[in-house]
UniProtKB/Swiss-Prot annotation:
Pfam family, any one: RuBisCO_small
Name by which UniProt lists this protein: Ribulose bisphosphate carboxylase small subunit, chloroplastic
Transit peptide: 1-56
SMART domains associated with the record: RuBisCO_small
Localisation per UniProt entry: Plastid, Chloroplast
Family: Belongs to the RuBisCO small chain family.
Biological function: RuBisCO catalyzes two reactions: the carboxylation of D-ribulose 1,5-bisphosphate, the primary event in carbon dioxide fixation, as well as the oxidative fragmentation of the pentose substrate. Both reactions occur simultaneously and in competition at the same active site. Although the small subunit is not catalytic it is essential for maximal activity.
């Protein structure tokens, strides 16, 4: 009975040969004492690899009096030659030209909801039917002129539609009213 009544402190201090040679478990990273010290002496903020100093350069497009209509709409209006060149590019890729116009808003807007990411003003009115089988850029330009005569205060855009993949591939503003 005397052997079973032993203090726990006596058991903890007892060690045999196997326990003395055990290595402590891994508890973290290696110490820096074994590695050479190489610190950067230049503390200039421009030398730090971070975009924190460049955040001031990023700006949001101002929505007041600078409406964005389509891709690259911040560029100057297309001349007649540039417009024909864009239409020829559209036709060369085999896309179907289609004209659309908008009499009130020539830009994306919210009208019936305030949900973020949803804009119900994305849809324009189609001018006639898509020009299936059209191979002449001047024919599309003539339709733009006809639409300008019918709606002089409307925005007119040309869409290139791929009827095989059933997607819109290109869209650009062909005419903006003088007020814009």
């Amino acid at each position: 009975m005397a052997s079973s009544i032993m203090s726990s402190a006596a058991v903890a201090t007892r060690s045999n040969g196997a326990q003395a040679s055990m290595v402590a478990p891994f508890t973290g990273l290696k110490s820096n004492a074994s590695f050479p010290v190489s610190r950067k002496t230049n503390l200039d903020i421009t030398s730090i690899a971070s975009n924190g100093g460049r955040v001031r350069c990023m700006q949001v497009w101002p929505p007041i009096n600078m409406k964005k209509y389509e891709t690259l709409s911040y560029l100057p209006d297309l001349s007649s030659e540039q417009l024909l060149s864009e239409i020829e590019y559209l036709l060369k890729n085999g896309w179907v030209p289609c004209l659309e116009f908008e009499t009130e808003h020539g830009f994306v807007y919210r009208e019936h909801t305030s949900s973020p990411g949803y804009y119900d003003g994305r849809y324009w009115t189609m001018w006639k039917l898509p020009m299936f089988g059209c191979t002449d850029a001047t024919q599309v330009a003539a339709e733009v002129q006809e639409a300008k005569k019918a709606y002089p205060d409307a925005h007119i855009r040309i869409i290139g539609f791929d009827n095989v993949r059933q997607v819109q591939c290109i869209s650009f503003i062909a005419y903006k009213p003088e007020a814009f």
